[in-house]
Design a protein with these regions (language model features):
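Membrane-interface helix-loop-helix junctions at boundaries between adjacent transmembrane segments
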Residues: 2-78
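Aromatic-anchored, glycine/proline-accented short structural segments
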Residues: 77-139
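Extended, compositionally biased non-globular segments
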Residues: 130-156
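Cytoplasm-facing juxtamembrane segments at the starts of transmembrane helices
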Residues: 33-54, 71-74, 90-115, 154-156
Length: 156
C-alpha cells in the first residue's frame, strides 16, 4: 500500500511505511516476549518465522522510500533473527516431537524466510555481495526443496 501511495504522495507513502514498520516491530516484539517467557522447543512451528523475519518485506518496498539506512537496518535485523531461529527450528524438526497433522500446513513456511531475505537483500543493496547472494540463494533453494520433498512424504 505504501509503495503504491508513493506514486501520488511520497510523504504519505513514507508515513504509512514507517507506521507499518513500527507496528510490525511492536507485534514481533510482543510475539518474541510471550514465546520466550514460556519457551518449549516442541511448541516451535515454522510459522514462528513470520513475526521476526517478516519485517524484511519492508526492504522490498524500502527502495522507493528514500531511506537506505533504515532499509539496511531492517534487512540486518530480519536476517540476524532468521540466523538465530534457523538452527533451533531445524533441531526441533529433526529431534523434537512430530508436528501434529493440523499444523502440517505451517511447515510450508520453512521455505519462505530465506527467499524473503534474498529478495530483501537484492532490493535494499544496490551493489549486492555475490557471496551473500549465493549463500541466500543456495539456502532458499535447499530449504524449499526440502519442504517440497517433505510435503510429498507427508502426503504419502
Amino acid at each position: 500500500l505504501a509503495y503504491i501511495i508513493t506514486y501520488f504522495s511520497l510523504v504519505s507513502g513514507q508515513i504509512i511505511w514507517y507506521v507499518a514498520i513500527i507496528l510490525h516491530l511492536i507485534f514481533a516484539g510482543s510475539f518474541i516476549y510471550h514465546r520466550a517467557k514460556d519457551f518449549d522447543l516442541n511448541h516451535m512451528l515454522p510459522s514462528w518465522y513470520v513475526p521476526p523475519v517478516g519485517i524484511v518485506v519492508a526492504c522490498v518496498t524500502g527502495s522507493h522510500m528514500h531511506a537506505p539506512i533504515i532499509t539496511h537496518a531492517i534487512f540486518y535485523l530480519g536476517f540476524i533473527l532468521y540466523c538465530i531461529m534457523l538452527p533451533a527450528m531445524m533441531y526441533r524438526l529433526v529431534f523434537g516431537d512430530r508436528i501434529q497433522d493440523a499444523q502440517l500446513p505451517a511447515f510450508a513456511v520453512m521455505g519462505a524466510p530465506a527467499s524473503l531475505c534474498l529478495a530483501g537483500y537484492l532490493t535494499a543493496f544496490p551493489n549486492p555481495n555475490p557471496m551473500i547472494v549465493d549463500f541466500l540463494l543456495a539456502l532458499a533453494l535447499m530449504i524449499t526443496t526440502l519442504v517440497y520433498i517433505s510435503m510429498y512424504r507427508i502426503k504419502a
